[in-house]
């Protein structure tokens, strides 16, 4: 067990992304959204400070970073849009972060249809890291992240947390998340998946806990302290894992 935690700790220390600073280039200016749709256009950095959305068919290019401030909302999972972020995405405590939507006909599985246009699909890419800290809800569906996805803490309430149908070049790490449901499904992940201290309060009879289903994982899958209503709970099947399965996920 100690060896498992040592491996997980080494992975997290070696790959945890730093918070984004200023960046980008060109003549575009930065943009702060305090509510409503983010207009199509090119921006240096984007700061989300209120309940912000994207319109169906919008095309947004960000040459730097996106920051979702405390208690703010970035809903880019309800309407199909094209969003290109050159650097990092960071969501702060109490924020809502939803990126990506597609119909089942596009993904070949249950997918995450766009509420505004159920047959439409988004195209969202992040050139750096995606990091959340104490975020209320995270929904990542069919996006591309070049480096790492790190979900540190958070209380999701009744909204499920999903990491689904994504292409992630680095590691996926989720630690200290409290939610009704948490799933890592149908992803292509270049390096490791580390899941630890995820507590679910799913009251459905026979709730199986954290879902880890049909992922392609380039290195290792490491799990510990995954619970549903205080009882150990994890369900995994159909995964292609190039490395080892360790801890609570051994043998998945």
Regions found by a protein language model. Give the residues of each.
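Feature marks extracellular polysaccharide-active and adherence modules
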Residues: 49, 55, 63, 69, ...
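C-terminal region of N-terminal signal peptides and the immediate post-cleavage residues
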Residues: 9-32
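N-terminal export and membrane-targeting signals
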Residues: 1-6
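Short, low-complexity, Pro/Ser/Thr/Gly-rich segments in the mature regions of secreted, periplasmic
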Residues: 22-27, 238-252
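Short, ordered "entry" segments at domain starts
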Residues: 26-73, 77-82, 87, 110-111, ...
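Acidic/polar low-complexity surface segments
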Residues: 94-122, 150-163, 183, 195-207, ...
């Amino acid at each position: 067990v100690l060896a498992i935690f040592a491996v997980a700790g080494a992975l997290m220390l070696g790959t945890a992304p730093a918070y984004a600073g200023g960046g980008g280039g060109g003549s575009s200016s930065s943009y702060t959204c305090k509510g409503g749709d983010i207009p199509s256009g090119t921006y240096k950095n984007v700061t989300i400070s209120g309940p912000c959305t994207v319109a169906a068919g919008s095309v947004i290019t960000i040459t730097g970073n996106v920051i979702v401030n405390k208690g703010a909302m970035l809903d880019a999972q309800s309407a199909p849009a094209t969003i290109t972020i050159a650097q990092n995405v960071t969501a702060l405590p109490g924020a809502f972060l939803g990126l990506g939507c597609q119909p089942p006909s596009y993904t070949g599985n249950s997918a995450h249809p766009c509420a505004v246009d159920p047959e439409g699909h988004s195209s969202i890419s992040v050139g750096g890291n995606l990091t959340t800290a104490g975020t209320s809800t995270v929904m990542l569906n069919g996006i591309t992240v070049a480096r790492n996805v790190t979900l540190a803490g958070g209380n999701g309430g009744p909204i499920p947390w999903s990491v689904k149908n994504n292409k992630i070049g680095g590691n996926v790490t989720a630690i200290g998340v409290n939610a009704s449901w948490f799933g890592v499904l149908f992803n292509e992940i270049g390096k490791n998946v580390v899941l630890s201290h995820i507590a679910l309060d799913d009251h459905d009879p026979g709730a199986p806990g954290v879902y880890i289903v049909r992922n392609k994982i380039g290195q290792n899958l490491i799990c510990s302290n995954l619970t549903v209503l205080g009882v150990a709970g994890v369900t995994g099947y159909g995964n292609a894992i190039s490395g080892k399965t360790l801890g609570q996920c051994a043998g998945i």
